[in-house]
Amino acid sequence: LWGNTSISAFKIEWFIASQTLAYLITALLALFIVLRNSGAFRLYWNFPFFKVLLKRSFPFAILYLLMACYNRFDSVMLERLLPEGVGAYQAGIYASAFRLLDAVVMIAYLFSVILLPLFSKMLKNRENIVPIVESAFQLLFYYSTTVVVLLIFNAEAIFSFLYDHHVAESVRVFPILITCLIPISMIYIFGTLLTAYGSLRLLNITSLLGIFVNIGINFFLIPHLHARGAAIASLSTQTIVAFSQIYLAFRALHIPLRKKICLSCVFYITLLIPIAYGVSYYWDEKVWVALLIGGVLSFILAFFTQLLPFSFI
């Protein structure tokens, strides 16, 4: 699709077909790996087990539904709260900025997939989870803050490369929206930890809180600020949910707050911002060079400020 190999007009259906094909290939590959490691198996219905499985899975399904609601309400409310034509246009502006956030969030999501079985096993065996939590926090804080700062300072060049129209409007929304990566990354750590601990009731409460906050702020800001209002609502919601889950995890699992890590985070952000600004200013016409050099310098800076300990190497 990206290679522009077709001579006919581009169709949105091509994206649907390619994504469906990608899912199918992934599913078949996963099935092949399972069969190779487990051998042949026969499918059959065990209704008592099926009933127990549904009962135990229901809280997880509710949690996923609630999280999906406060993550996706913004674009829907933009179309519904604004006049016809304006709503669709502003939803498009919001979506153009959201696509990059949706892409970079995948790294944090992969962390949560790895952390869930790890946390579950350690909690079951009554092992000390603090080192793993701290390491995950340091890595994802480094990743999220670095990506946010570098993308914000190079936003105009990136959006000019990705889009032909409405670049200025998207760039105004993007810095607010991409900052959501930081609280989302924290949610993927501490929400996963609470899930492994079995605190689904608390997680569902924080997700309900997120829905109410998101709807309330959207109702207030969208009529005045349009797409920027929706971005502010999203950032506010993610931040409130993240802090709620961090507080609940620290309280439930008695995780100590280490001042050294907090100071490292502050020093890293304080030094990263001027470095990223200087790099983007000097290589303003070579965005990929700016991102590469900024990434290398941020990696060195993370060890210099001890945000990432040398033991990680």
Locate the predicted segments by residue:
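Membrane-interface junctions at transmembrane-helix termini in multi-pass inner-membrane proteins
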Residues: 1, 9, 178-209, 251
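Hydrophobic alpha-helical transmembrane segments
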Residues: 1-36, 208-214, 227-248, 293, ...
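Alpha-helical transmembrane segments of multi-pass membrane transport and lipid-handling proteins
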Residues: 107-108, 130-185, 215-219, 223
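Transmembrane helix-bundle signature of multi-pass secondary active exporters and lipid flippases
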Residues: 67, 79, 89, 94-113, ...
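Membrane-proximal transmembrane or re-entrant/amphipathic helices at the cytosolic face
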Residues: 278-313
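Helix-terminus/linker motif at the lipid-water interface of multi-pass membrane proteins
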Residues: 2-4, 8, 65-103, 121, ...
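Interhelical loop/hinge segments that connect adjacent transmembrane helices in multipass membrane
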Residues: 3-16, 30-71, 114, 118-128, ...
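Helix-loop junctions and terminal segments of transmembrane helices
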Residues: 97, 101-137, 144, 191-196
